[in-house]
């Protein structure tokens, strides 16, 4: 059977369209947004959106792709933040990029340490183990003054950031810095989940006993998931402290943040790279939408001081809906909508 000229050219046209779409998106996010977005959008929406997307990527490595449940995401973020802070303060000669990588490496080492129980336990018991990491790390940073450079206040001002001559002090520069780091790590994530290690993670997630039978080193595969997940979370934690909060403190990495990151991957889609953006957008925008709808909600008898409780109710309801009706999250819904739209276009 011979292919027609149109059938041969179709894949090339598709690749060209994807390339042009990627270039257009790059121009918008790297050039258009810094030029046109105001400081509120950059500081309060876009920067936390990018960092939480990155944190979702880290947790997705562990939970979405490798199937290891965790409630300690914020703990590993705090390790990365404190490690990077100490490197910046104690070894000022190191470039910022090296500080971030070393902070992520320290977080990866701690992640492997708390991942050791995964060699023996799973499910609910593993969740409890990672939850212990959350409480232990916060206690450690609160009680041991060395981590906070012997500062008695417990709240450290984030040091000024710079990469060579570039001073990262304005909202636009912080946005571009976070965007650059997120772009690199997401590109790394795409390559990783398509690699042999990514396939091993999914085999362990689906059935670790069968994975062991076919020769996959289950223990090492799980620990690599903890290491790489914590590495990304550690870098996200440093960005969270330096580019968003402006401070380094244990309260900035509480259990609520761990739940938020878990909600991101459940709502966005476990085992999905793009779903991290969708879940993070939902987590960041929902409180803003509820706050802006305070007047309309007040007419329904919902007081303004009850908005936070309403937010929790909405999150809880959506978690149940997605787990029962669509475990693959918003990413799957978007994919189905795109397939229907392209099918209509071809008719």
Residue ranges and their predicted role:
Residues 1-347:
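Transmembrane alpha-helices and adjacent helix-loop boundaries
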């Amino acid at each position: 059977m011979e292919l027609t000229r149109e059938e041969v050219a179709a894949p090339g046209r598709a690749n060209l369209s994807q390339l042009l779409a990627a270039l257009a998106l790059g121009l918008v996010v790297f050039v258009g947004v810094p030029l046109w977005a105001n400081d509120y959008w950059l500081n309060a929406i876009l920067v936390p959106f990018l960092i939480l997307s990155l944190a979702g990527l880290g947790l997705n490595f562990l939970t979405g792709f490798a199937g290891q449940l965790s409630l300690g995401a914020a703990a590993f973020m705090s390790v990365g933040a404190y490690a990077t802070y100490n490197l910046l303060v104690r070894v000022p000669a190191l470039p910022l990029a090296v500080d971030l990588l070393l902070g992520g490496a320290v977080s990866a080492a701690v992640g492997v340490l708390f991942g050791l129980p995964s060699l023996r336990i799973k499910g609910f018991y593993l969740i409890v183990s990672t939850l212990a990491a959350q409480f232990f790390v916060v206690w450690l940073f609160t009680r041991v003054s060395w981590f906070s450079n012997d500062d008695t206040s417990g709240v450290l001002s984030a040091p000024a950031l710079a990469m060579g001559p570039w001073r990262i002090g304005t909202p636009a520069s912080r946005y571009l810095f976070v965007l650059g780091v997120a772009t690199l790590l997401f590109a790394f994530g795409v390559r990783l989940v398509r690699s042999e290690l990514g396939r091993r993670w999914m085999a362990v997630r689906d059935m670790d006993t069968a994975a062991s039978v076919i020769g996959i080193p289950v223990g090492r595969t799980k620990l690599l998931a903890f290491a790489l997940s914590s590495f990304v979370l550690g870098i996200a934690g440093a960005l969270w402290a330096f580019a968003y909060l402006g401070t380094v403190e244990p309260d900035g990495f509480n259990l609520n943040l761990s739940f938020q990151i878990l909600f991101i991957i459940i709502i966005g889609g476990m085992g999905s790279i793009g779903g991290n953006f969708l879940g993070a957008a939902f987590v960041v925008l929902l409180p803003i939408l509820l706050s802006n709808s305070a007047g309309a909600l007040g007419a329904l008898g919902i007081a303004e001081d009850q908005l936070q409780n309403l937010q929790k109710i909405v999150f809880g309801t959506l978690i149940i809906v997605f787990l029962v009706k669509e475990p693959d999250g918003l990413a799957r819904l978007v994919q189905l909508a795109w397939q229907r739209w392209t099918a209509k276009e071809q008719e």
